[in-house]
Amino acid sequence: MPEFTHINGDKVQMVDITAKGEVKRMARAEGTITLRSDTVAAIRTGTVLKGNVLATARIAATLAVKQTPQLIPLCHQIPIGAITVDFTDTEVSITAEVTVTSYGRTGVEMEALTGVSVALLTIWDMVKSAEKDENGQYPVTGISDIRVIEKIKG
């Protein structure tokens, strides 16, 4: 059975990282939102009524990375060195990729994952009126495949 460092019996605790050495850390995460092709086209051409979808999602991802310890209770507050947010698209999807670097005692995976999640949620929020069907449902829209694709320590 794997060892869970955040659990001690029936108690939940923040892991003590004070004895760890400080090294450069990097994590890259990605995730995808599936949309109607007309919606992706509107994002590409900048004709979404709420404004520039990807610029807004980039800002939201950056803010989310910096707020991760307030959202995930056992995450350490760590100094963030850099945040990069990139988007790629297909005819029916947009993939967000967030890279976070730090120089510290613990990794930045949760920060990268949080950034990706909030970027994708922001995209959904900005285009939801175009994604709903006549019943107010989202038959096409979905967020998937959020994962860490690279991690470097040292």
UniProtKB/Swiss-Prot annotation:
SUPFAM superfamilies given for it? Answer: Molybdenum cofactor biosynthesis protein C, MoaC
Q: Which residues form the active site?
A: 125
Q: Name one Pfam family in it.
A: MoaC
Q: Give residues annotated as binding substrate.
A: 74-76, 110-111
Gene Ontology biological-process entries: Mo-molybdopterin cofactor biosynthetic process
What class does this enzyme belong to in the EC scheme? lyase
Q: What's the catalysed reaction?
A: (8S)-3',8-cyclo-7,8-dihydroguanosine 5'-triphosphate = cyclic pyranopterin phosphate + diphosphate
Q: Which residues form the signal peptide?
A: none
Give the pathway listed in the UniProt entry for this protein: Cofactor biosynthesis; molybdopterin biosynthesis
**Enzyme Commission code(s) on record:** 4.6.1.17
Q: Which UniProt keywords apply?
A: Lyase, Molybdenum cofactor biosynthesis
Q: Which residues form a coiled coil?
A: none
- This protein's record includes keyword Lyase: yes
Any one GO MF term held by the record is:
cyclic pyranopterin monophosphate synthase activity
Its biological function? Catalyzes the conversion of (8S)-3',8-cyclo-7,8-dihydroguanosine 5'-triphosphate to cyclic pyranopterin monophosphate (cPMP).
Q: How does it assemble?
A: Homohexamer; trimer of dimers.
Q: Write out the similarity annotation.
A: Belongs to the MoaC family.
Q: What is this protein called?
A: Probable cyclic pyranopterin monophosphate synthase
